[in-house]
Amino acid sequence: MRSLVLLSSVLALVAPSKGAFTWLGTNEAGAEFGEGSYPGELGTEYIWPDLGTIGTLRNEGMNIFRVAFSMERLVPDSLAGPVADEYFQDLVETVNGITALGAYAVLDPHNYGRYYGNIITSTDDFAAFWTILATEFASNELVIFDTNNEYHTMDQSLVLNLNQAAIDAIRASGATSQYIFAEGNSWTGAWTWVDVNDNMKALTDPQDKLIYEMHQYLDSDGSGTNTACVSSTIGSERVTAATNWLRENGKLGVLGEFAGANNQVCKDAVADLLEYLEENSDVWLGALWWAAGPWWGDYMFNMEPTSGIAYQEYSEILQPYFVGSQ
């Protein structure tokens, strides 16, 4: 990142072209596992992603990895810190390991707008938390800051204000070159975005690198907990309204979570979703599968190489959308 050669490669990574994504990759889960068991024991309650298997996915064409972690483990006493040294260093090592591969690493506090189960109401405390993270990664242009995973059942103005507090704190910390992903209320669902999160268009970023992160699953209730997808076209249908919202408001989006189970309807639905997003890549910069990670076992969406069922069944579907494959 400190040389002109590397800077050129970074610019090549982020420059979108018509009909092509900027990012296609996967979530990396594990460090947020063991919810409620804090601080928990590494290897028992939680696990960090495997940089070896991330390297496999990177070599195959993925260029973005969203690293979930627990705020309670990172800052156990207060959102304002101090950090738990071992957990913090493990996070730093994971993120730097990803960016050393030339891929983007998304910092994902996987907390649903909550801290120890309580809704975060203090924008000052939230800003203090983000000051800690942004200061650490201020010089790494391949880091992306995701304000929080899937705010839900919260006051809508509070969701807006927490996002703005995070943006302001990140920029004030000197992290001015990185993208920021803002998430909305109601689990940041694309299919409910227009009805629930219209006020999010008021967010401002002095660096103009704000991306709206939405999630979308394809089962009947949109939860991503059922093996059946509604139809082969449900993907495009569920993101159409959000696509129009992005375009009408001059915003950019990323689908931060999507997935499908191992059946033909879901495979067709995922292909339909990706095709639609790529056709609208003037507003959709990319998408991330949910999820890879060492502990998924027989989970229906497991993207962990090489035994994960989704890795085996969906890699061929995802590959044409990898950046540089078009």
From Swiss-Prot:
Alphabetical keyword list: Carbohydrate metabolism, Cellulose degradation, Glycosidase, Hydrolase, Polysaccharide degradation, Secreted, Signal
Induction pattern: Highly expressed in presence of carboxymethylcellulose (CMC).
GO biological process entries: cellulose catabolic process; glucan catabolic process
Active site (catalytic residues): E150 (proton donor), E257 (nucleophile)
Keyword hit for DNA-binding: no
Record keyword Secreted present: yes
pH-linked activity: Optimum pH is 4.0.
Pfam families cross-referenced by the UniProt entry: Cellulase
GO annotations of cellular component type: extracellular region
Compartment list: Secreted
Catalytic activity as recorded in UniProt: Endohydrolysis of (1->4)-beta-D-glucosidic linkages in cellulose, lichenin and cereal beta-D-glucans
Enzyme Commission number, as recorded: 3.2.1.4
Protein name: Endo-beta-1,4-glucanase A
